Each structure stands twice: as C-alpha cells, then as structure tokens.
Amino acid sequence: IDAVWYHKPHLPKNLRLMQPPEYRPFVSKQFRSLWESLAGLLADKIWVSPYWNMIRAENKPHQLAIANNIGFEVPETLITSNPDKVREFWKYCGGEMVVKMLGTAPMDDKVIYTTKLTDKEMKEIDSVKLSPAIFQQWISKKFELRITVVGDKVFAVAIDSQSCPGNEIDWRHQNKNLKIRPYKIPEIIKDKCIE
C-alpha cells in the first residue's frame, strides 16, 4: 500500500438492521477502532485526506476558530442548548438565523441540513435543551464555494445553489440538478486555505 484514499467513510448499510439494536453502538465503535488502527499502521503513507485531519475537521467550533484566526470572515455564531440564549440571538440577528448540527450525523449516515429558522420554529425552540447546536446569523449568497486542498494545490468550484429550489439554504439538500463549475479564487484566499 502506497497511498490511502480516505473520504467520507461510512458504516455498513446493514448496521441499522442489526438486532438487537443495543449492539449497534458497539459495532460502530469497532469500525472506528479499525479506522484508527489503519491510520496508525499506515501513518507513513500518503493519505487523502489524513485520518486525524478528518477527525479534527468534524469539530465545527474548531473549524470556525481556525477560519477566524487566519482572517476569514465568520458569521456571528452562538453554540448553545439554552433556548433563552437562542431567542436573544434570534433578536440580535433580526430574525435571520440558521441552525446547524454541532458535529457529524451518527444516525445511520443521515444528514440534518442547515436550516433557516422561522417564527414557527422559534416558538418550539425549547427543544434545543435536548442537544446543543450551532446558530449563525444568516448571510444571503449568490452561490457557494467548495474548496479542496491537496498538498499545496487548491481546487475550487462554484455551486449554483440559489437557482435550484430547495437548495437555497444548504446545497446538499437536493443536489441532483445543481450546476457546478470551476471557480478561480483570489490568491489571498488560496493562501488562507493552504494555511
């Protein structure tokens, strides 16, 4: 083995069928242990993307802090499970706010997409007590960028999320008809991405 392509590993699809269901967390942990073992055994090989980097990338607060520290503009952000704090932040944002998962989705590889909160959802915000989440001021956009860094090479694509109904908030929601095109980003942005 000379190189490892490690991109979005998934648990076996039939794991959700495992009976009794109490065994699922155990088996899930065994797969995580396998991936960690491979990361150690193959540490001297080329990884795309390195296992431990992917683990760090799952930590959204860490990502936000890094982005802010290297000079990217980061939306106003609140991480909490306190509904009163969410209500205060909602007012601060003028009712223009999104909610995101704090981490990756462990539930059968399902994704909970970024959602723009409405007055109706804010009336039910007490449910946030069950689990912390990331709340951010909504920023309108013309399109979204997906940037991939491999070594010192930076590849960017523009995702035309605003022209595809259902994708205006989160391009991943219904990505079948999305137009994606190469995009030239400024050198200063490239440098920050490599940093």
PLM ranges: what are they?
Residues 85, 91-185:
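Phosphate-binding site of ATP-dependent enzymes
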Residues 70-94:
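Rossmann-like NAD(P)H-binding beta-loop-alpha module
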Residues 47-49, 76-80, 99, 135:
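General beta-strand structural signal in soluble alpha/beta enzymes
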Residues 1-73:
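Conserved N-proximal alpha/beta basic substrate-recognition cap immediately N-terminal to
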Residues 184-195:
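ATP-dependent carboxylate activation and anion-phosphoryl transfer catalytic cores
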Residues 11-12, 52-56, 79-85, 103-105, ...:
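Short acidic/polar capping segments at secondary-structure boundaries
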